[in-house]
């Protein structure tokens, strides 16, 4: 077994692999789907809808951020809707389940959004 942390995500067209030798990591890739706006209220609260619901790109970012954070946190009983997004859609750091995660956003191909979340050691603030 690899001595580190691995996360995998894919869309019908692309696949992504994230590896970190020290810290839990999560990656999520999504391709825009017309059903996403109808699903958004199931995983986003009203404040998140106001910040991230303004465009397809932000809605995809919200979904991939929650999914990547969920994977990095590794808490089976955690529900994606309980992961609260930061007020700033471009934030490089967020807190979820009492832990701090660094965030990286990638747009490799038009229509795709990829978010990488890395669980930071306790006491670090994006270092």
Q: What does each of the following model-derived ranges do?
A:
Residues 1-127:
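Core catalytic alpha/beta fold that binds nucleotide/phospho-ligands
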């Amino acid at each position: 077994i690899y001595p580190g942390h691995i996360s995998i995500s894919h869309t019908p067209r692309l696949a992504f692999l994230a590896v970190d030798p020290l810290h839990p990591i999560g990656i999520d890739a999504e391709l825009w789907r017309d059903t996403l706006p109808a699903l958004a209220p199931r995983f986003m609260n009203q404040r998140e809808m106001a910040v991230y619901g303004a465009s397809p790109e932000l809605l995809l970012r919200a979904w991939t951020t929650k999914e990547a954070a969920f994977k990095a946190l590794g808490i089976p009983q955690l529900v994606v809707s309980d992961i609260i997004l930061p007020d700033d859609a471009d934030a490089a750091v967020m807190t979820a389940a009492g832990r701090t995660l660094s965030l990286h956003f990638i747009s490799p191909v038009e229509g795709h959004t990829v978010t990488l979340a890395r669980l930071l050691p306790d006491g670090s603030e994006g270092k």
